[in-house]
Amino acid sequence: FSDLDAQFAGGAVDIDLMETDLGLSATICAAGLDAQVAYGIPQFRRIPFCGGEMAYALSIVRQLCGHIGRKVAFTIDGEELTVDCLMCAVCNGRTYGGGFYAAPEARPDDGWLDVFIIRRVGRLTIARLLGMYKGGKHFRDGALTEQAKPYFLYRRARRVALRPADGRGPIVATADGECAPCDAVEAVLRPLSGRILLPAPAYERFVAKRSSVDVK
């Protein structure tokens, strides 16, 4: 996106958007541990000489030292379930949070949201799960991998609502980097309601991928 020649040589594409309680989102709306970490970073940045990775690391430490996980009630295209969860992500795009491949096979123009819920686990298991999640190793060929199945739930949907079900107050959520405590969060798909300009290489890949999907 920093190459102006490539930008002008590219093209515009239509993508799906999510309408959420935090505003319109083009990529991922998440709640739980990862959102709590992101929400806490600005507080540490106010400390002198504490910015960037240091603020991120301190926010993680604070979250891990506190109560981990929430009981959350989900309504996913009419399906209702209550889960003790570490965190969850409603995905229109593939990555967020500095390179976490939350939804390795998501497409922003296929008319679906990929929903991943990570069950609450002990502190010793969190690092392993986050490593799997960051590398996108929890999902392959349209399904959860065997190593992910004990810990992850997966759905495809067009409307997702969630609310805390443990009486502990609001849950922290994030959408495209905007964080806030919420009493409830809803994400509703708005098919092909956004348009973005892609630089030439990305535009060519996007069009080729869309063509291959249409052929199938």
Residue spans of the language-model regions?
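Catalytic core of DAGKc-family lipid kinases
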Residues: 1-87
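A short catalytic or substrate-binding loop motif that flags glycine-/basic-rich loops and adjacent residues
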Residues: 10, 64-66, 109, 154, ...
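Glycine-rich phosphate/pyrophosphate-binding beta-alpha loops
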Residues: 30, 34, 89-104, 178-179
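Short acidic/glycine-rich loop or secondary-structure boundary segments that cap or lie
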Residues: 34-37, 82-84, 96-99, 123-127
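Gly/Ser/Thr-rich active-site loops/lids in small-molecule metabolic enzymes
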Residues: 45-55, 98-99, 104-127
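Glycine-rich, charged/polar anion/phosphate-binding loops
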Residues: 57-61, 70-77, 97-103, 144-148, ...
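ATP/nucleoside-binding phosphotransfer catalytic cores, i.e., glycine-rich phosphate-binding loops
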Residues: 76-77, 82, 107, 117-216
